[in-house]
Amino acid sequence: MANVVVIGAQWGDEGKGKITDLLSRSADVVVRYQGGVNAGHTIVVDDKVLKLHLIPSGILYEDTTCLIGSGTVVDPKILLKEIDMLIENGIDISGLKISSTSHVTMPYHRLLDEAMEADRGSNKIGTTGRGIGPTYADKSQRNGIRIRDLLNEDRLKDVLEIPLKEKNGVLEKIYGIRPLCKDEIIKEYLDYGKRLSKHVVDCTRTIHSAAKNKQNILFEGAQGTLLDLDHGTYPFVTSSNPISGGACIGAGVGPTLIDRVIGVAKAYTTRVGEGPFVTELQGSINDQLCDRGSEFGTTTGRRRRCGWFDGVIGKYAVYVNGLDCLAVTKLDVLDELDEIQVCIAYELDGKEIDYFPTNSDDLKKCKPIFKKLKGWQCSTANCRKLSDLPENAMNYLRFLAELMEVPIAIVSLGANRDQTIVIEDPIHGPKRALLR
């Protein structure tokens, strides 16, 4: 039995959904511990493409409990769309549970998010415009609406009074946006509450009960390490903590409950939105990675920025999260390249550094120092064990493991479930050297 955290080791979009889906087969409980509908993961099942933003990937397994934890912010309108989509595809959603203390994204949060981002002009952050930041801001200011508030009309009227008055004032006086109607919001969100009520639980008690019964618990993060509010490329970050420590806070468990932390990293690097990106590529190779990797955001549809694998941020992710092993995804995207580069250090103000600068101004000045490796120029999409991989592909993986000083447990070679090499089951397997 093992309790495992799956986190993104880059700027999000690493393929965590597929890895979580894979590991969910061995999990009894899957917990989403932070983020909101600004995240998105795509799962391919029997040629069906399922795109989820809030519901954990484990929902595809009927005996698995899927819990949206207290650290997650929930847009009930989008959540219900996901529920309806799953039901239409014949997927049982009885295992879905929602923490009663999760905060709710309200209509004014979305309006404020869009208005504030537009107002920033050239200094925009690159927000998805889904209201995540304003929702977390209200949570921090103790002015938020929680899932439990949608279950009682009198309570919803009471807790909505002050924030709606404040937000309407800001929307109207600063941004020239028409005020929202309280009665309409109450009616709409009480309806959401009725539909979701059968899924609402006490998050901490649910996880504690599972742990007491020796069940396997999988903690699923959204976004990635470099988007962490405290440890990412601030201010170009999200409004929560995707790193492994965030799992304890967002799920309501102690750190001693965590047995293993798995980092998910692409075989190259991508980033959506604004912010420094040291290994970013331009021109034909960037286009090739983007096209072969289908690098368009699940949530926004925005084209992702692409670059070579950055070992500096990789080592930073290992340290910040305490990674035990790695899952490397999209290795197949590199199949056609005759030469592949990996960033092994930065140059900052004429000096070589091997650490990640936490100051975004310094990071913008950094230049990558690359190690060139030979490509393999043949398809890896049908490889199912390590011995099937071309020698240069194996050399590439070994180099990444050596550079990051952490073993590789899983290699993904495409979107489908079976396009995966599992070197060791991170939940049931012993903690030992995998691929170094």
Curated annotation (Swiss-Prot):
The keyword Cytoplasm applies. GO terms for biological process: 'de novo' AMP biosynthetic process; IMP metabolic process. GTP binds at residues 12-18, 40-42, 304, 330-332, 412-414. Pfam families: Adenylsucc_synt. Transmembrane segments: none annotated. GO terms for molecular function: adenylosuccinate synthase activity; GTP binding; magnesium ion binding. It is found in: Cytoplasm. Keywords: Cytoplasm, GTP-binding, Ligase, Magnesium, Metal-binding, Nucleotide-binding, Purine biosynthesis. Its cofactor is Mg(2+). The active site is at 13 (proton acceptor), 41 (proton donor). Pathway: Purine metabolism; AMP biosynthesis via de novo pathway; AMP from IMP: step 1/2. Its main location: cytoplasm. Its EC number is 6.3.4.4. It comes from the Bacteria. The keyword Transmembrane does not apply. IMP binds at residues 13-16, 38-41, 128, 142, 223, 238, 302. One of its GO terms (cellular component) is cytoplasm. Binds 1 Mg(2+) ion per subunit. It catalyses: IMP + L-aspartate + GTP = N(6)-(1,2-dicarboxyethyl)-AMP + GDP + phosphate + 2 H(+). Mg(2+) binds at residues 13, 40. Substrate binds at residues 298-304. Homodimer. Plays an important role in the de novo pathway of purine nucleotide biosynthesis. Catalyzes the first committed step in the biosynthesis of AMP from IMP. Belongs to the adenylosuccinate synthetase family. This is Adenylosuccinate synthetase. The lineage of its organism: Bacteria, Bacillati, Cyanobacteriota, Cyanophyceae, Synechococcales.
